[in-house]
Amino acid sequence: MKLFFSFLFSLFYFISFAQEVAILKYKGGGDWYSNPTALPNLVKYCNDYIDTNINENIKTVEAGSTDIFQFPLLHMTGHGNVFFSDDDAENLRNYLVSGGFLHIDDNYGMEPYITKELKKVFPNSELIEIPKNHAIFSTAYNFPNGLPKIHEHDGKAPKAFGIFHESRLVLLFTLETDLGDGWEDEEVHNDPEEVREKALKMGANIVKYAFEN
């Protein structure tokens, strides 16, 4: 088993220089497939404006698959239920502590499910609010006030929570912002251009942070 995980770590170390992102598919019945144009649009924005060279063919990977180790950044979203099996949780934990990064964007209604399931991934860690002076808010574009507000749901302020491993932010949970809606094609939500621009810029920060840390 140790040899197996050593192999995975070596594999991840080798490919972490590649610029790849993927959508994380999970169990539980939640719509992991929501916002289908979001990640492709963010990738194109990053390639155009922050000098990345990300593969624009976005793949989908399952939480329990070793395929996740091919991607320095995983994106997860949805509105409803999330379930991680013990194998899923162990696989995600190994991925994250080996250098991977997971961005979870609550598309509205995901919070109570994902917070419970993350306790399986990191039983001894809590989601903590990320301070506004953290590097993720300034890697490519400055957001001195933290996350931008993209969509109104409950009228609450946007929040960024994270889990840290050995001082490195390995997981970002964005709540009450709906960044992914702002990344989607303009006609999907009819967001004003300046709102979509804020969402894409914050997304570019997340991508840049994940690739460089």
What residues fall within each predicted segment?
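Short alpha-beta junction capping motif
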Residues: 21, 73-112
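Acidic, glycine-rich loop-and-strand cores that form catalytic or ligand-binding grooves
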Residues: 116-147
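Positively charged n-region of N-terminal signal peptides that target proteins for export
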Residues: 1-4
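Solvent-exposed loop/turn segments at secondary-structure junctions
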Residues: 26-30, 79-83, 101, 108-112, ...
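Short, surface-exposed beta-strand/loop micro-motifs that present aromatic residues
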Residues: 64, 155-171
